[in-house]
Each structure stands twice: as C-alpha cells, then as structure tokens.
C-alpha cells in the first residue's frame, strides 16, 4: 500500500491509530469505535498484520541521509521530524537533568541511552540498516498481538493466525543485557543551562519489573514521599517551609524489564542549592527515621487500587496493561496476584525495601543550574 493508506483507511472507519516507544518496547495500536466488531475489525487485523509483517518503508518517506551541518537540505522527511523532536526535547530543562542522571546510573546497560536516539545517528542511518533491524527483531517470538473488546473469540483467533503468517521468519537472537548494580558511592553530576531556577534529581536503581511485591512497595513509597499535595515532600518542602526554597518537589517510580528507576526531584531557588539538596536528602532518609504511618500506608494502597481499577475501564487501557505484563514482566499471571500482594504489604516491608533501594550512597544526583 502507498504511504498513508493504513491511517486514512482506518481513520475513515472512526479508528484512532498511533504508536509509541519506550525503553523495553514499541507498540502500535488501533482503537475502533463500538460496534466495529465485524468487518471493520477484520479489516484492521488485515492492515495491521500487513504493516507489521511487510512494511514498505519507502526511501522517499524516510529521506536520504545527510550531514547535520549542511544548511542546504530542504527535502524534509521522517528523519528530519525525529531530529527536530530530539532538539526540542534537548532544550527542556527536566530532560537535561534526567538524561544526565540516567546516563550515570548505568555502566553498560542500553538503558543509559536516550530512547529517541541522537541527531548524528538519525541523520546517517540508511534504509537498509532500518530494514535489517526490522527483519532481525520484528519476529514471532518478539511480538504480542492483543485484541480487547466484544467479538467472537474463535473467529478472531483464526483471523489472527491467518494474517500473522511470518512465513518461516527466524526468531530474533536472544539478547542478554548485563544487569548493572547500583553505585557504591554517591555520584554528583552538575551542569549549566539557560534557566532562572535550579533543578535537582536523585536517581536510584530498583528491582526488575517482574519482582511484583517490591515494585508495589516502591509505588507506595513514591505516593507517600511525593506524588500529591498531601505527600511528605510537598507538605514539608513547600507548604510548611518558613522561607520559599522550592517551586516543585516530587517522586516518581518507573518500571523496566531489567531494573526499575526511582527518582526524587525538585525545582528550587539557585542561591539555596546546598540547603535544597540537604532537605531533599533528609526527606528520603526520613522514610526510615520518621516511620511511615498506618494512615499513610492505607491512603497509598487506596490510591493504587483506584489506579488498578482505572486501568480496566477502557479497551485501550486493558490492552496496554496486558501488553506491559506480557512484554516487560513476561508473566501475565502477575495481574491476578497484584491486589493480593498489595493487601499483604506492611510498614516493615516498606522499611526493608527503602533500606535496600533508596540508600543515599547508591544515588546519582543530577543538578542543573543557571549559567552565570
């Protein structure tokens, strides 16, 4: 099919078509309107399979390789779109802080790289290299097809088996990434940027995504520490501070196949750098010193239950949840164990997990300050 046929045909049926990529996966999805379980669903499967198994990737859409410092390139194609996105993201202060932190959290693992790539690579990669990557990794063993909705299961399974015929394509080579261990000393990375305020990020390596109970425990800790205006960081660093030091203070937990990331971050006044670092560090250490309360634990559990329920409200969310557990955790049964594990977690469990993963000596601290 010609470029654009897939999108135009399905969008004419009322479908939403998109794709996304992250550290462990890329996913392509089609969401059809209710009532499209018959021929429209069959058409979507046919076109989706055609796109996944036999992409054309025309040279004229990718664009010819070019030198980055050549101002005469006027034929802007897909590679130029990606490069512009890289440049836009690179100018964002939080992206700078995160990239510096992430790069120094890993010694060898590919997670240290930026997912979107670099302008140097994107400007030079050839169509042959892209097709070779596709032929190597878009294989039966590496792909999961998920269909959620109200349809005849047996008929749709038969349709998927028919359309997704890889015609003997070999499976992708098994990749065994060397798992990095946390640093045994605090690493501080400092940089300058065009900003009026300063940015701070503490980064910690966590458990693998399929270590379900520890992951839920870190989700709970993230909520207690810094995920809302009632969190410890917001209350202690913003709401109750006698002088304004912080504009933002929060915590986030990202889950990855080979090991998660836990971030504690803040945006603060440049002249208060030492004080800001000390206060954020104190909040992390106080997860042990100032014991988590039953009230904090129950409130966080309630919030996680709501998220879990919300993830089952639409076909898109159900599909994404199944895809995550199939691809990143490699164990669909973990969905069934989730709420049971959540209910079993105690304050003592949280203390053990905090001591194990949120030790300041294992942190990478990234700081971005204004240029003088």
Predicted region positions:
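Histidine-acidic residue clusters that define the catalytic metal-binding segment
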Residues: 38, 99-143, 175-179, 208-210, ...
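C-terminal regions of mature proteins
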Residues: 144-147, 291, 295-372
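A structural supersecondary motif
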Residues: 16, 201-205, 225-267
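Non-catalytic, conformational "gating/processing" segments within enzyme and secreted inhibitor domains
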Residues: 67, 73-74, 79, 127-163, ...
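An aromatic/glycine/proline-enriched structural segment found at the starts
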Residues: 107, 115, 120, 139-209, ...
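Buried hydrophobic packing residues in well-ordered domains
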Residues: 10, 28, 48, 82, ...
